[in-house]
Amino acid sequence: MQNQRIRIRLKAFDYRLIDQSTLEIVNTAKRTGAKVLGPIPLPTRKERFTILVSPHVNKDARDQYEIRTHKRLIDIVQPTEKTVDALMRLDLAAGVDVQISLG
């Protein structure tokens, strides 16, 4: 796996879950002898929704909600076979979306 790079993108609504998962990935990669770049925090996406409270009148009465999507990027440079095996066996939280690409 010479001159390979593994890029891992993580997405989650809860920043604590994504930080915990990031720490697990980084520790696993370093323990198996790979060089790790990151974690790099990417911009947080904020979706805002405004909903009318009243079904008929009172246009001024509204509720506002927000969903924040936190993102992190990790690059693993010069991964070993042990690194790939350890990352495949890693058990992460259910609320974290993981995208892995080889480059």
From Swiss-Prot:
A Pfam family it matches: Ribosomal_S10
Role description: Involved in the binding of tRNA to the ribosomes.
Subunit composition and interactions: Part of the 30S ribosomal subunit.
MF terms (GO), sorted A to Z: structural constituent of ribosome; tRNA binding
PANTHER family registered for this protein in UniProt: 30S RIBOSOMAL PROTEIN S10 FAMILY MEMBER
GO cellular component: ribonucleoprotein complex; ribosome
The keyword Ribonucleoprotein appears for this protein: yes
Family: Belongs to the universal ribosomal protein uS10 family.
UniProt keyword annotation of Transcription present: no
Gene Ontology annotations of biological process type: translation
Keywords: Ribonucleoprotein, Ribosomal protein
Protein name (record): Small ribosomal subunit protein uS10
Xref: InterPro entries: Ribosomal_uS10, Ribosomal_uS10_CS, Ribosomal_uS10_dom, Ribosomal_uS10_dom_sf
NCBIfam families noted in UniProt: PRK00596.1, rpsJ_bact
Domain of life assignment: Bacteria
